[in-house]
Amino acid sequence: MTRPRGPAPRDGAAWRRDPARRVLLRDAVRGREGGLRLACAVMAGLIVSGGVACAQDSHMAVAGAPATAVAPPGQPAPMPPATVADAAHLAHAAAVLELLLDQGYYWLGQHNLGKAHETIQRALSIEPDNNEALFLQGRLQMAEGGTTQATRTLERLERQGAPAGLVAQLKAQIQAGPVDPRALAEARALAASGRMMPAMFKYKALFRNGDPPPDLALEYYRVLGATILGYQEARTRLAAWVARNPRDIDARLCLDRILTYRVTSRAEGLDGLRALARSNVSAQIRSDAVAAWRDALLWEPITGQSIPLYDEWLAQHPDDTEFTIRLKKAQETQAGVDAANDRQQGYALLSRHMLDAAAREFHRAVDIDPHDPDALGGLGLVAQARQQPALARQYFLQAMQAGPDAAGHWRAALKALETGGGGVDPLVARIVQAINAGRYDAARADLATLGRRPGYGLTVLSLQAALARRQGDTADAVRLYREVVRRAPRDAGALFSLGALDVQVGDATEAADILTRLQRLAPAMARRLEAMMLSAQADRAGDDDGRIALLRRAQALDPDDPWVRLKLAHALDDAGDHAAAQAMMDALTAPRNASAQALQAGIIYAMGRHDTATAGALLERMPRTGRTPDMDRLASLVVLDQRIAALNHAPVAGNAAVLALADQPDPTGERGMRIAAALLARHAPQDARQALARGESLTQPPTPARMLAYAGTYLRLRSAFDTTRCLDAFDAMAKARPADVTADQARARQQVAIGLAIMTADGFDRYGRTAQAAQVLAPVLRAHPDSVEAHLAMGRVYQTRNMATRALEEDETALRLKPANIYALAAAARDAGGAHHLAQAKGYATRLAHEDPDGPMSWEVRSDIERIEGNSRGQLADVEHARHAQCTLDGEGECGGHESFVSDYRWPLIDSEYMDLHGATLPASYHYIPEDDGAQAMDRQIVYLRDSVSPQFDANTFVRSRTGVAGLGQLTEFAVPITATLPFESWDHRLSFSVTPTLLFTGDPLTNAVSAHQFGTVAVNGARPWGYHHYYTQGVGLSLNYVNRWFAADVGSSPLGFPITNVVGGLEFAPRLTRNLGLRISGGRRMVTDSELSYAGERDPGTGKLWGGVTRLFGHGALEWSARGWNAYAGGGFAYLGGTNVIGNTETEAGAGGSATVWQDHDRQWLRVGLDLMYFGYKRNAYFFTWGQGGYFSPRQYFGAMVPVEWSGHNRRWTWFLRGEAGYQYYHSNAAPYFPTSAQLQGQADGSPPSYYGDSGASGLAGNMRGRLVYQLDHRLRIGLEGGYSRAGSWSETSGMWMAHYTLDGQ
């Protein structure tokens, strides 16, 4: 890169532009730049102006110098020799400095830091304070990683008052910081190996999808311009760069080189390269321009169009042997083209009986090639028409001698001449013209007239066959051509036409026989027919390599057939070789005299690549004679694409403006398909459907092409009904006229049908109906065992069935069919990970990265592997890379951060349970929504992952009220748990700390004689005066919780401040035995919170002693099965319960149950129904409040069967949960003594009964209800409310809770 120059320089760079002006403004020059700058300016002024300014000021005189004579007016004053010598020396120094600065810019642009350092140091040795040299030094320091040194250099420039442009550029580079050297080396290695597309994505990731730093800009644009996706961006940005910096020669060179990459701009690029090669710039720039000039010429086709370019090159490089050979070949090719053009024009003129003009064209052809049999024969026909039989005979004989292969044709003409036959029949010529122009009724009328003439029977048959073929009546055309061949077995033209039709209808046997006959009669026609047969075989090839090989053979046989080239280009695109495909089509359309068919094929290819600019340029080159109805249709599509592109430019028009384009008939379906695709790109599927509906209503009757095109578009819209409808309509029309269906249409219909089956199967699979999905795919795989997509779809079915190994087998089958298929590689990597073959998964991911480096799918697969390994932070980074890559592919540029604020993307874990000492938290949960497109799904995942790895806080206000006798079983709890959670690499590995202020309220048991008798030791000791009060307590509970995937542990204490405090905690192991089956084993010590006595402990009003504070020491095990749509569990456990001055007790429990989703709405609402069976039993009944009892529900037996019904859902900011449970319960509690831990107290109580609690029990209905509603206030804060009611055993309970969750997500 050469150095930029601002419009108004303040330093010495300016005098290089206008030295004479600087001499006159010497005061402006003198100053901080020093004497060298002044002297250099003076000398440069002398050189440019040719004279010396007369110094009038005394301070300009040199002290001690001899006086000089005053020059006459108008004459420059002579200078002393010493002054002249000094000035010359200083001018030389200025020139050296100029050269060194230019070289410094160049070597920095080339990233040759060693040479750049040497050059810049030499410049600074000449002028240490030179602003540009210091600017270059700062850039070099940044390139070497010396940010601190570069900052000091920047400060020095600011102190010197350097130009603002230099300061701003260096400041921007310092702020951008050094780039990752490893990633930069990888990007450069990719570019050096010619893999420009992967290199482009690597550079974009390196620059975070932003602008490149100045020292890497040209390097990046070179790579960007060599890619299909980045060419236009590189061209636009480089053009703007050069416009801002017109003297940046390196950028000019880069732009000109990139312009030569496309045929439409190659001439402009060549002009620029030639100018640079001949200009007075540095030798390296000239050398690079010459090399780029030569490379561009190598891309030019070897045709007559390139002859002037070759001549110009060889005039300066006469020893270039390769271009000498190319020039000779181009001249030969052009001679052949000119001869062919003259010959064709001659025959056209002959058909209109313009004999003189026809003779001139034939003579031109013969001048080029004296042995051209067709031109010689044409001259014979002209002579015959002029009634010159001797001359006609001479030309026919010469034609027979010049072309033995076509001798039979001219022999027949000679025979007709000798027997007195006439020339070209005007009626035949008129019929041919009418058929070619599409005037079929006129052609039929003239055919009827011709058929009445004697001796024209064979001609009429041939013309009828041509008419039938042109109208698409293939069966009748085959019948007619067979009759022509039967009557004239050596008619090469009829044989060729019949063979071409056989290829079209798939009659390979007859086509092969005709090929054999043509090889003897007309080898050139035989080669064309063989090329058609190979092209048809390519249509049926099962793999890209085989298809490409067949098409290359076809192209070698018939290199001038544009349609074979178009097929080959499409095959190369399918195989991923886009550069070769583009080069092939450029070579086809580059010649100035490219045929109309070649231009048409180029337009079709360009439109398929969404290259509207190239399509429009080729359309402008189309001659009027080539503007067939097909070309007019293509032209309308080009205009449509241009209008859509204009509507998508800022300011972007609304969807209605795009939909309004569907305002005219659409017989081929391409118009509606393009409009629908544009609306789909805007995420407007309903508008896309409306566009297709308009196309159908405006085009009646339907055509096969349109119905097939619409079927494919409806498939993209995931509309199975409309896809099936369009396919059925296409099949009905194809059945009525089977010959009308081309091989391409048949293949497209097959692919749409396969896609429809896969979409149907995926729909079943999504909701767990894998049996139906497999039934849909099985016949597809039998009929199309080479369908990669079908194998991948079956793999997804197996994956849903948790048969990861079988899924991987299907993926590997697909990979055997197409080893480089990125979708198969992605599926194999995911399924290998699902089978826990992580090494294999990473191997497939590596292969995918090789095929699609930095593509969205590569990053998504990496994120899946990170997920399997439990690394959500790595997964988040990978998904963000995937999202940015997708934005780049979609042309959106840098992705915005708005997705973080989409309320629908945040779904809290709505059914989290309230846990003592911890509360109920509202962490993020992830939900897959089938309606999401790829970008939305990634945004949703990014939001979830950001939240799940961010520190977060939860706070609750919890109130619970339990029924019972005041002062005994009655309890009101008020708790405010506050929990801080710190995730590590994922939410499954986290640490939480909770603080829970808690207040418990119960009544005064002593206010009632019955309740007083059942409390503490009052029954035998009475109550002391201080005992008469409402019993309440308060404290603060603490808890530390650790989770690491399938392991969890917690430790804490019951609220500090309660009468009795206990250390509590637990462990849980929950490994997955299979994908569906899990084992859960837990144990620990927990509080029993049935009453204030069991929860906090109380003081006996009779003795003043404490009792209560019960804890449960438990162990529990369960097996849990979870599958899509349903789950089940079964387990049991044992516990020991004890407390302060409380009788010990044991519990056994068991339970089983499950639930299933019975209804869901668009994956946003669910209704689940289940069944829960439970049993528990205690050794003792301790649900009393006298001394030694525990105050907790403890029946001898409890059986319950409950049917839960649960409705949950999410809508924008709202998430809810409502669960109701009802069923049958039976329980029985044993009798118990008043004082189970003291025989003495019990003995005293026996003296004043009652001293025993009787047994009790009940059966009947039980149930509970709980509901929760959560609202997302913003991307960090959500709040919620919960209410619940339970009735079980002999008690009921009501609860309510307010909830808040705050995430420190850094957004």
From Swiss-Prot:
Pfam family, one: BCSC_C
Repeat positions for TPR: 97-130, 270-303, 339-372, 374-406, 458-491, 493-525, 528-561, 754-787, 788-821
Localization per record: Cell outer membrane
GO cellular component annotations of the record: cell outer membrane
Major localization listed first in the record, in broad terms: membrane
Topology term for the membrane: Peripheral membrane protein
Keyword Transport part of the UniProt annotation: no
Protein's UniProt keywords contain Repeat: yes
Protein keywords: Cell outer membrane, Cellulose biosynthesis, Membrane, Repeat, Signal, TPR repeat
Pathway(s) served: Glycan metabolism; bacterial cellulose biosynthesis
Signal peptide: 1-55
Biological processes annotated in GO: cellulose biosynthetic process; UDP-alpha-D-glucose metabolic process
Family according to the record: Belongs to the AcsC/BcsC family.
Role of this protein: Required for maximal bacterial cellulose synthesis.
Name the UniProt record assigns to this protein: Cellulose synthase 2 operon protein C
